[in-house]
Amino acid sequence: MTGIDTLSSFRHFTDGLAPQEHLMPVLFVGHGSPMNGIEDTAFSRRWTQMAKEIPTPNAVLVVSAHWFTKGTKITAMDFPKTIHDFGGFPKELFDVQYPAPGNPILAKETADLLHSANVELDHDWGLDHGTWTIIRHMYPNANIPVLQLSIDRAATGEMLFEIGRRR
């Protein structure tokens, strides 16, 4: 998102967005085989249909089980790279790119909201296959900012539950 480099410019930008009257739903979606990212399957068709059944989000935050870190991190770059964190699959799967924008300002705001988890802004990771194999079916135009939140490998289930309760 170019041109949005201060909180006031971000607020000006968001003032022009359609208001969200309700909280967005929280979805738990497993990707199954990474091949679901490129094949027409019952899973991929359901992900496409699911996106039609819920309001279009202004951004998507994904907690990925494929990103275990020391501490909690959130992607905070303008354009997160597509990560192919698997092996033994056809070249066609490795060729997939999902060029969704990120949103560093929203990442910072999210980190601030989760202050008790000491969330660190990350500028290196990107979107792993736990994210893009699903999101590319839901939002194929890659025009909605996508942020990815890691799982702290030292966190207890209770700590992770508390992170999920924050709004």
Regions of interest found by a model, annotated:
Residues 107-160:
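Internal, conserved structured core segments that host functional sites
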Residues 11, 45-46, 136, 153, ...:
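Arginine residue identity/basic-tract feature
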Residues 30-32, 130, 164:
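Glycine-centered flexibility sites
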Residues 3-117:
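A short aromatic-anchored loop/beta-hairpin motif
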Residues 46-53, 158-167:
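Long, well-ordered alpha-helical scaffolding segments within enzyme catalytic domains
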